[in-house]
Amino acid sequence: MPIDKTPEKNAILFVWFNHYAGVLIKTPSKTIIIDPVDIRARSFPDSDAILITHEHYDHLDPRLIAEIQKATGCTIIADPASAQRLQHSIPPDKLQQIRPCDEIKVGEVSVKAEKCNHPATAPVSYIITSEDGVKVFHTADSLPFPELAAIGEREKFDVVFCTVGIAPGTSPETGFEIARLTKPQVAVPYHTNSTEYQQKFAELLKAELPRTACLIPELHKIYQVSKRK
């Protein structure tokens, strides 16, 4: 499942690789994996960083992460609870803990943690800004929260991943509320195994937020998103 091509200028490529929050993002110079579970390590022959949002089974697989890290030498960036679970399997110089408002650089790519409204120990969401300034908001499996409006206004997101199912309390409606608050150029409904939920999200978006495009992803397919003009 590696992305064997480079994004166009002012763009990123991404792949959704499980029914949860598993996303692979490729910028011009870096490959970043988020919440890898239910997939084989050999699917990721290249990785510069793995980001973990929280410690639940559908987001954190310590054995898989250790296998990918050993093969690629990548850096692991994780919330405090996940970092604690990884501390004995990841070299100390390759494991970085992150909390909301912290920022870590992966080369010229910025990784910033934000709040996540989800019943885990200390969950985070991630703002990833590419070398070209393309802004991606990976919201883990967060429910909406009021601060999203200010975050969206500040960041002017190009793409936001919105949970529409599986996680507690989530639905197409809560996913749409994340999009409504953040107002991205492109909204991606994920964290579901229901195409019906994704379609419902798309209908809400078209009716209530027509200036935001909906991209319904298929598993393992490569998509490109460009910086807003």
What positions do the PLM features span?
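A short acidic, amphipathic alpha-helical/loop segment
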Residues: 63-68, 89, 147-151, 174-178
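Catalytic metal-binding/acid-base residues of hydrolase active sites
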Residues: 56, 82, 117, 143, ...
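Binuclear metal-ion centers of metallo-dependent hydrolases, dominated by the metallo-beta-lactamase
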Residues: 16, 90-107, 151, 176, ...
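Alpha-helix capping/helix-boundary segments
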Residues: 21, 57, 82-84, 102, ...
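Active-site metal-binding motif and surrounding structural segment of the metallo-beta-lactamase
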Residues: 38-82, 154-161
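Core dinuclear metal-dependent hydrolase active-site scaffold
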Residues: 1-45, 97-155, 170, 217-229
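Proline-aspartate-enriched helix->loop->beta-strand connector
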Residues: 73-74, 156-157, 161, 166, ...
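Short, Asp-centered acidic motifs that coordinate Mg2+ and/or phosphate
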Residues: 31-32, 49, 159, 186
